[in-house]
Amino acid sequence: MACRYGLKTSLMLLAWASTAFSGLPARAVQSTCAETKTTVEMSLCIAKVLEQKDRELSVAMQQVATDASSAVGGQFPRIWKSSLNDLYKTSADPEEQLAAFQQARRNACVYLNSLSIQGTGFGIFVSNCEIRMTDALMQSLGR
């Protein structure tokens, strides 16, 4: 089941991410990839960082689903699933949620790139933005 967030939702994610962190993850990526000498090396390094963060996010989202399904009383899981299905057009399946988040994250970061008139370093800019948004979600999940 593919999930497509609209521009409004993507921008909400973007606004949330930009207020949740004040540049700290970007600095962390810069220090992680500080030894790179070329744009290609930087792009590859940032891509690896993003892949690792997505693996960590997948585990965290699985834990959220596990916690929700074991909530006492059964009310929270119904409300949670209803919100995911009706409002966000996705499911309680963590893999579908991850895919939906990744698509919305990418859309928001590409849009932000166009707003900031970044002509060069598109991939690096977008990937750094995606890392910051992922870090913001992980912080929200308490991870």
Question: Predicted regions span which residues?
Answer:
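Bacterial N-terminal signal peptides that target proteins for export
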Residues: M1-L13
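N-terminal alpha-helical modules
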Residues: L24-R143
